[in-house]
Amino acid sequence: MQTELFEVDPLSDNRKLYARAAEALGAGALVGIPTETVYGLGADALNPEAVARIFEAKGRPSFDPLIIHVHHGSEVEKYTAVPEGLKDLVHTLASRFWPGPLTLVLPKADIIPDIVTSGLPTVAVRVSAHPAMRGVAKALGRPIAAPSANRFGHISPTSASAVQKELGGSIEMILDAGACSEGLESTIVRPVLDEKGKPSLELL
């Protein structure tokens, strides 16, 4: 397989490119997509066969769940089943930290395939601050499952060239937006209800 590389010009309107990447994802392709933290290996999160290709390409164990990316915090309700007692906390976190490098682990909605969560009842959700990830997610109209775009156990890539070196020939497309601004994985927290039914946070 030949991996196509497309440059994302920060000074241009990239909507046609994002639409092209979204079309590829919709057809079951894998696409390397930049975020502000690291490059992600994207697949249509609602397509179990495409998600299975992520595990295959990365050599990732099937028991290791994936993060999903959505275009906007308002979409979280579609893909999660947050209990009433946690909704205010989740809304506060989303309003304060999204878009940005924060991942929330929340009870999943039935629409999310079990392969994404490795059979767990929760799903990790994020809204990236990078225009490429958000733009592709918006164009796709569905969540993007996207762990780091590298072989399992290797260093997470912060450039398109690193993605090409790791996964070139096993994925269809890479969007090259230069180096990631953060270069570190996102912070992961799980909102929970304590024994008294009060909302709190667990840092994962």
Locate each region found by the language model.
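Active-site-adjacent structural elements in enzyme catalytic cores
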Residues: M1-L204
